[in-house]
Amino acid sequence: MKIAIFTTGGTIDKVYFDAKGAYHVGAPMVRELLVHARLEDIPEVVELLRKDSLEMNDDDRQLIRTAVAECDAPRVLVTHGTDTMVATAKALQGIGGKTIVLTGALQPGRFADSDAAFNLGLAFGAVQLCPPGVYVVANGAVFPADKVRKNLELNRFETV
């Protein structure tokens, strides 16, 4: 089963930047997390962007959409910052014949207490099992793109 993985940045890829505790988006964590999960066959990981999702714009979403639409894999996993993940998921709707799953993390993937490995594992399963469509995976759930929002007050995703 062919799966494409695209990375766009976000907290999942963040690293400490300076002594003040500021972060910046570093190299993608996906491959490292999948190696730790002991996957037998790790798909190629393509870095599209290295941005905090709050810095993403419509041009970035179009770049992601084009990459997803033009890749030959019927199943696509996209790592993304959580703040604007839903907006990007909605921008990917309408791409036919593909199962597209977006996931990210609320804590950097390099942190031991991060939700990154769990979210990525669930997303990897979802991309293989869900029918064609666009989904957001977070907080132990798989949400259809048109039925999810991020509750900023609770810092979690929920069904709408």
What are the roles of these predicted feature ranges?
Residues 1-160:
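Active-site histidine-anchored catalytic micro-motif
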